């Protein structure tokens, strides 16, 4: 988050110690280097873990110097000072503190990825060792062994690189599979170099990625796995640039990649029955979208251009248009996702910063949206985005503003944009409603009419 705990946060020093404690206990060794001899760690994993740990110790030591006491949290007020202390300078339009925080987040992501391998390794060695062996082949290149997905051979990805996407599709389409075997996670992490321009140009890989975005089970979990193992940023290089990318402000508390995947998670959760109570309209809309994968693509790209300089919405719109062309979206689908990325902030802006009781504001927003389909997709994207920016950002009040804007715009679109908005008609309608309420309570309307005479239609 915005102020991660260097010791106890996921991927922090405690995770490194946990690797040491559990592995040394299981293998009965005293030094981490002996874990290489035991085959638990590969040599390059050992060296990378050492480098990552050394970086975190430097950060922790620097924090203690700055705070003049034991301080484990990378407090916002300390981040800029610590970045300068460690040699990160402002350069090429990017703040030194943002470069430092990106290095931090990429480091803990690397440790988390290695943790996946090692903890799965221990799970198999300790808890699954005496299980009844049950294997079932699920595709030409993969089979399920005791609930865990495995490759047919130790070099499957070398001969079948497409498997680097297919394995996540299988997980997204088969909810009964518990996870991936440690040896296979290791293969994935060590095969990212196979994802090159030719891989990205392969129609089969592109179709598989689109199939993944339609997968019924735990899509955000699979995308997070792909991110930890380095696959997502290799397949989508533009996504790779935002991995660990932080904005040094108090508004955005997550790195851009984490925020993006959280938006997708929020959107997909709307399909759950329990979400209908908290988000009744967005939930209903999402369940009835003709092409929900277009919303997922828009979410994946809405902040893709953060950190480049310039208008990230416009730059991201160009990126998603390129993605759409590569993945053979229809022209109308491309136009929709491009529009959503370019305009993903407008509904939040209008609902919170403009007077949505003004018919002209509603009419202007309805003109920007154009039709009901664009309004539906934008509303769900906006709800998912706000909830993934900062847990404290979403309030019932902001939710009611968004819902009010949605409903008024829906009515404006139903009425037709070609019909000019008559403020006096809106005002008269309001008077009629009030008059009816007054009469129901046996209250004379003369006093209200006197007040109305002193104020305008607004």
Where are the language model's segments positioned?
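A glycine-rich phosphate-binding loop feature that marks nucleotide/adenosyl-phosphate handling sites
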Residues: 76-81, 128-134, 184-192, 239-245, ...
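Hydrophobic side chains within alpha-helical segments
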Residues: 18-20, 262, 388
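Regulatory modules associated with amino-acid/nitrogen control
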Residues: 55-56, 95-149, 219-221, 366-458
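Non-catalytic interface/linker regions that flank or bridge core catalytic/transmembrane domains
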Residues: 1-252
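Alpha-helical scaffold segments in soluble metabolic enzymes
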Residues: 110, 166, 170, 208-211, ...
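Divalent metal-dependent catalytic cores for phosphoryl transfer on phosphate-bearing substrates
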Residues: 37, 44-45, 49-58, 65, ...
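Long, K/E/R/D-enriched contiguous segments that form extended
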Residues: 197-298, 307-313, 318-328, 342
């Amino acid at each position: 988050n915005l102020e991660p705990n260097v010791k106890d946060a996921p991927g922090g020093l405690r995770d490194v110690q946990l690797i040491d404690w559990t592995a040394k206990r299981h293998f009965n060794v005293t030094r981490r280097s002996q874990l290489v001899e035991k085959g638990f760690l590969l040599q390059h994993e050992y060296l990378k873990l050492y480098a990552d740990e050394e970086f975190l110790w430097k950060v922790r030591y620097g924090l203690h110097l700055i705070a003049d006491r034991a301080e484990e949290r990378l407090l916002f007020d300390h981040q800029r000072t610590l970045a300068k202390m460690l040699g990160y300078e402002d350069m090429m339009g990017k703040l030194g503190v943002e470069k430092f925080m990106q290095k931090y987040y990429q480091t803990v992501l690397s440790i988390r990825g290695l943790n996946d391998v090692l903890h799965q390794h221990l799970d198999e060695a300790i808890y699954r060792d005496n299980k009844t062996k049950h294997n079932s082949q699920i595709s030409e290149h993969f089979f399920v062994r005791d609930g865990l997905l495995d490759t047919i051979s130790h070099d499957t990805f070398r001969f079948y690189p497409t498997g680097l996407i297919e394995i996540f599709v299988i997980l997204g389409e088969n909810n009964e599979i518990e996870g991936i075997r440690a040896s296979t996670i290791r293969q994935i992490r060590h095969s990212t170099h196979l994802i090159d321009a030719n891989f990205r140009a392969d129609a089969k890989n592109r179709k598989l990625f689109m199939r993944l975005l339609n997968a019924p089970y735990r899509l955000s979990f699979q995308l997070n796995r792909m991110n930890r193992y380095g696959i997502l940023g290799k397949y989508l290089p533009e996504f790779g640039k935002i991995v660990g990318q932080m904005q040094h402000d108090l508004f955005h508390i997550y790195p851009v990649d984490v925020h993006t995947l959280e938006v997708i998670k929020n959107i997909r959760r709307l399909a759950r029955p329990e979400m209908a109570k908290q988000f009744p309209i967005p939930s209903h809309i999402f369940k009835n979208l003709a092409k929900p994968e277009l919303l997922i693509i828009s979410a994946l790209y809405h902040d893709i251009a953060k950190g480049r300089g310039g208008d990230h919405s416009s730059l991201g719109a160009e990126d998603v248009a390129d993605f759409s062309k590569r993945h053979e979206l229809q022209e109308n689908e491309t136009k929709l996702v491009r529009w959503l990325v370019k305009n993903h902030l407008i509904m939040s802006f209008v609902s919170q910063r403009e007077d949505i009781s003004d018919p002209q504001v509603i009419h202007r927003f309805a003109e920007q949206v154009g039709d009901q389909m664009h309004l539906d997709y934008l509303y769900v994207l906006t709800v998912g985005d706000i909830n993934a920016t900062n847990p404290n950002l979403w309030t019932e009040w902001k939710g009611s503003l968004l819902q009010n804007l949605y409903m008024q715009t829906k009515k404006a679109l139903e009425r037709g944009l070609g019909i000019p908005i008559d403020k006096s008609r809106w005002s008269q309608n309001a008077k009629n409603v009030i008059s009816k309420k007054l009469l129901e309570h046996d209250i004379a309307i003369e006093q209200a009419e006197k007040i109305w005479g002193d104020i305008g239609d607004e």
